[in-house]
């Protein structure tokens, strides 16, 4: 999800300011994306730490965290 949020933010930043203002006023896109980005990162970090505590090597814990986050979120 964080990759999607980054891509949306990049495209959003290229919009004219009046369009961004309208989107923020009626949709609150920035707030939605910030919340999604925050919780997605928080969940992914939690999964990663749990995998590390279970004895997985870094690469495996990272892969499992990314895969589970992609599937679940």
Which stretches of residues belong to each language-model region?
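Mature secreted bioactive peptide module from preproproteins
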Residues: 1-73
